[in-house]
């Protein structure tokens, strides 16, 4: 079947893409702003793209009005983030962190999550304590 992508709505294009690439790993990205506020947000446009050097990628879309998301702003300002993988036990909390809260709202608190400082002393971003077994400081 041939899809003329330029004729599809943005929503239909998204649905086509997300139903084509399966299974879909979700990067649960934790960042910290320069003032120390922690942000957690899930990204389903995520994958590993290289083993040597180890590289992961995820796509950060914008907000409806063209505003940048906190995750992107924090990464640009600090250069640091931690990728956690979502598992079945944390799926509900992940959905809560997907809500478009105002910047002042602590997603971790809303989702009942806790965090621990990264084991990499050069990295200030946090990893989720009750996430999956995989956390990658970047």
Regions from the language model: what does each represent?
Residues 1-39, 47-138:
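Active-site-proximal mixed secondary-structure blocks
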């Amino acid at each position: 079947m041939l899809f003329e992508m330029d004729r599809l709505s943005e929503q239909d294009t998204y649905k086509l893409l997300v139903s084509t690439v399966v299974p879909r790993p979700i990067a649960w990205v934790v960042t910290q702003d320069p003032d120390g506020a922690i942000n957690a947000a899930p990204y389903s446009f995520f994958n590993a793209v290289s083993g040597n050097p180890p590289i992961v990628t995820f796509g950060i879309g914008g907000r409806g009005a063209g505003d940048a998301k906190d995750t992107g702003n924090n990464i640009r300002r600090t250069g640091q983030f931690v990728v956690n993988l979502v598992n079945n036990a944390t799926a509900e909390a992940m959905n809560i962190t997907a809500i478009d809260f105002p910047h002042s709202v602590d997603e971790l608190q809303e989702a009942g999550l806790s965090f621990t400082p990264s084991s990499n002393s050069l990295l200030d971003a946090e990893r989720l304590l009750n996430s999956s077994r995989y956390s990658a400081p970047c």
